[in-house]
């Protein structure tokens, strides 16, 4: 925990150089139509679920990180830095934070709270058992103006975990097709994903067809 506190302190100093008056952090133009404000509003919770949840979450934070925002990935041990880089996230702006698996819920809440002091975006997968802590965590993030991007691979898990986070925007993904698979051979070069955006900040469902990733390796709009 001390290492995270040191990192957060250093990041806070650097983050002071980034204007905080801008209430909306940028997203890639391919994703902008999925957000009511065409970007990430500070203090909001974004839920990503379904077959391409992690890929979408990385795409969501990439543009803001490129623009200078710091991203903490808390409790996501399977998140690969190579995948993050391929999604466009500058690794110099990404810090991976482990949680104590012997007491995951308490450790998760503690690490997220500490990260809120120095990071503008927190990417995380809330562990089972954290439900009773979610409201307090969310209130702290809102007070700090931190964007929380919560990931769930199961589409129906968004209601049980992310739903209790009171997501401002919920992005559900469904893989439509993979590109590059021949007749029993060939490498995968792209994935077409259908994304639906709902949430308490969305007056109506919003939909988009995206490449996650596209043939060039980066996210993009289909068509």
Model-derived regions: residue spans:
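Phosphate-binding/switch region of NTP-binding enzymes
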Residues: 153-223
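Structural beta-strand/beta-sheet cores of well-ordered domains, especially the beta-sheet scaffolds
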Residues: 44, 120, 191-193
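Detector for small/aliphatic-rich hydrophobic stretches
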Residues: 1-73, 199, 223
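Long, charge-dense
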Residues: 70-139
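Solvent-exposed alpha-helices and their adjacent loops that cap or buttress functional pockets
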Residues: 38-41, 114-116, 142, 185-188
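Structural alpha-beta junctions
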Residues: 66-70, 91, 143-147
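A contiguous pocket-lining binding segment that forms or flanks enzyme active sites
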Residues: 116-172
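Signal for well-folded cores of large energy- and translation-related assemblies
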Residues: 35-36, 65, 85, 117, ...
């Amino acid at each position: 925990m001390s290492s995270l506190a040191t990192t957060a302190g250093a990041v806070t100093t650097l983050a002071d150089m980034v204007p905080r008056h801008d209430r909306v952090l940028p997203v890639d133009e391919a994703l902008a139509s999925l957000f009511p404000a065409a970007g990430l509003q500070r203090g909001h919770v974004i839920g990503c679920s379904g077959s391409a949840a992690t890929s979408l979450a990385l795409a969501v934070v990439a543009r803001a990180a490129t623009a200078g925002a710091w991203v903490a990935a808390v409790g996501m041990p399977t998140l690969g830095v190579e995948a993050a880089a391929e999604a466009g996230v500058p690794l110099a702006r990404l810090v991976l934070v482990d949680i104590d698996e012997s007491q995951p819920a308490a450790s998760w809440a503690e690490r997220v709270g500490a990260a809120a002091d120095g990071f503008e975006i927190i990417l995380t997968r809330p562990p089972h058992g954290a439900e009773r802590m979610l409201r307090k965590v969310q209130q702290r993030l809102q007070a700090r103006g931190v964007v929380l991007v919560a990931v769930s691979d199961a589409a129906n898990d968004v209601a049980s975990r992310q739903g209790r986070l009171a997501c401002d925007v919920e992005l559900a993904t469904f893989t439509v097709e993979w590109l590059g698979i021949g007749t029993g051979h060939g490498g995968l070069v792209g994935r077409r994903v259908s994304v639906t955006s709902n949430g308490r900040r969305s007056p109506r469902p919003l939909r988009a067809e995206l490449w996650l990733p596209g043939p060039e390796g980066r996210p993009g709009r289909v068509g």
